[in-house]
Amino acid sequence: MSVEKQSFGTTKKGEAISLYTVTNKNGMVMKVTDFGAILVSVLVPDKNGVLTDVVLGYDHGEDYQVNTPHFGATIGRNGNRIENASFVLNGKMIQLTPNENGNNLHSGPDGFEFMMWEAESKEQAIAFRHHSPDGEQGFPGNFDVTVTYTLTDDNAVEIHYEGISDQDTVANMTNHSYFNLGGHDSGNVYEQTLQLNATTYTPVSDSKSIPTGELAPVAGTPMDFTEPKAIGKEIDADFEQLQMTGGYDHNFVLDKPEGAFDWMAKAYCEKTGIAMEAYTDCPAVQFYAANFLNNEKGKNGAVYDKRHAFCLESQYCPNAVNDTHFAQPFLKAGEKYDTKTVYRFLVK
């Protein structure tokens, strides 16, 4: 196991950005940066032993300061959408910044992904720390948060989120990596298969993607990934939910006890033989098929387009702060926020 640190550019404020490269005993490589606590690269040996970068991203830290698609981003304090960019907490209306169709998406334009984090290098892990002051993004409470990326010797990237606030607040963090198991520059993911540990999903009310509040069964619909299925098989089906969102961009409620750590998704690319198993203790996962990627210039000259990747964002249900049907993402003052999501890679 080795860890290397190198320059990765400069922020608009003149701060030095660093890139940390962790390599395990199998030759698998994980690259993360202290700008946004972002996952930059995951290089996995394919069935022929060729190192293959399976996450989309950019070559330079400067590029991540725009990062409209949220490549590899640590999202916080809240992932996904909050209707009307507002909610009530302890009888008080909390107003956030609307940044998508009048709603708040991924905590707004000043999300954690656009901030410098303090980095600490460990034997096989990089820990990133951030102090989020009371009122940052509109959320109450001083929130001290740590995100630790660990590369294990069984070829897993573990992401551990920890935090504590001095006031009741919202804590619903996630990682927005875009995966392509054929390689980040290999084109669309239509032929790659996906299986989700979910028999229900949360339908959205319209193209603004706020859930209706109901849990709908996936059975008999294109939303059924209870068995491995090619991502492209039904993505353009004549199905209202898919037409509203331009393809898969939906929250699936995981079939497991609340708080239990269990598998959420399994994906596979026959071309490379690379498989990925994802695990979490969160109640749900957003499956997004990169429907809105368009001519995005990425790593090593790659150009990323529509459906060239997929995201599996562990989370509380979208807009849960405004919908008591769902598990609530509120963190009590003085209590510890502690959640883990793991992406493990293997060859089949």
PLM regions with names:
Residues 1-348:
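An exposed, glycine/acidic-rich loop-and-rim segment of catalytic or binding clefts
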